[in-house]
Amino acid sequence: MKNIVGNKVVLIGAGDVGVAYAYALVNQGTVDHLAIIDIDEKKLEGNVMDLNHGVVWASSRTKVSKGTYADCEDAAVVVICAGAAQKPGETRLQLVDKNMKIMKSIVDNVMANNFDGIFLVASNPVDILTYAVWKYSGFDHHRVIGSGTVLDSARFRYMLGERYDVAPSSIHAYIIGEHGDTELPVLSSATVAGVSMRRQLQKNPGLEEELEKIFEETRDAAYTIIDAKGSTSYGIGMGLARITRAIIHNQEVALPVSAYLEGQYGQEDIYIGTPAVINRAGINRVVELELTAHEMERFIHSANTLREVQEKFFPPAN
């Protein structure tokens, strides 16, 4: 990986998620230059103009431009938000056929322009497509990151905060596994304002049913939002901006992303949601949480669900 001096990001895909991410990135002043690529060039021109007008009020000046794949050569991060959007009633895994070919075309174009930074993937199903980007790019897996369960974990923290009247920043709780229907909460290591949820469950067994309901609302939130407004955008846009900030500023912060496993949780050769330490080089290391037997059972089911789909496109070597 060559030494990339600047803080340039290339965003591929300026739909609802991409534009929300661009707005968050510009508003936070994270990068020097944001180049945006999209097939709808007229709409892209309008978004670039609109974002540049807002830079006046941002914390620092970010150059926003209509990009081409040539911009990837000196980019620190390429963020992929392109692909078919999830429709009402459609699961994320059902998107895979539509989006796999799109990923192949995008990665081929990026790599043809000597990109040597970090890939950040948000297109769904994100775990499967992050694996695809890794395979198609030929990069070391540490340099390919998926948004994973960063949004799911944020939703869970928000909903727990509403339940306990505590700021989400004072809640430490992860959703892991597939970014989708088989994900799971890790209540055994969760804390609310420093208080162990495991201990609370031991004191009050009836609390488990309430927490499971909160988790189900978390898991199904995307369906509710899509049914109401057509797509999710702001939450994932801000989550992607957070991951980008961790990369650009070499923060060594643990975030729940889609990371490649090499034996952690007993799993190999799969991208799946788990906490991982993020820095300028990508994923520094995967954080393997200590799971209860029941949590591990659910995690294995989630991994097997992803692997079943993954192997249709990338059969395991004999």
UniProtKB/Swiss-Prot annotation:
The modification Phosphotyrosine is found at Y223. It holds the Pfam family Ldh_1_N. NAD(+) binds at V17, D38, K43, Y69, G83, A84, S105, A122, S123, N124, S147. It comes from the Bacteria. InterPro entries: L-lactate/malate_DH, L-lactate_DH, L-lactate_DH_AS, Lactate/malate_DH_C, Lactate/malate_DH_N, Lactate_DH/Glyco_Ohase_4_C, NAD(P)-bd_dom_sf. The keyword Cytoplasm applies. GO terms for molecular function: L-lactate dehydrogenase activity. GO terms for biological process: glycolytic process; lactate metabolic process. GO terms for cellular component: cytoplasm. Allosterically activated by fructose 1,6-bisphosphate (FBP). The active site is at H179. It is found in: Cytoplasm. Beta-D-fructose 1,6-bisphosphate binds at R157, H172. Homotetramer. Catalyzes the conversion of lactate to pyruvate. Belongs to the LDH/MDH superfamily. LDH family. HAMAP family: Lactate_dehydrog. This is L-lactate dehydrogenase. It comes from Corynebacterium diphtheriae (strain ATCC 700971 / NCTC 13129 / Biotype gravis).
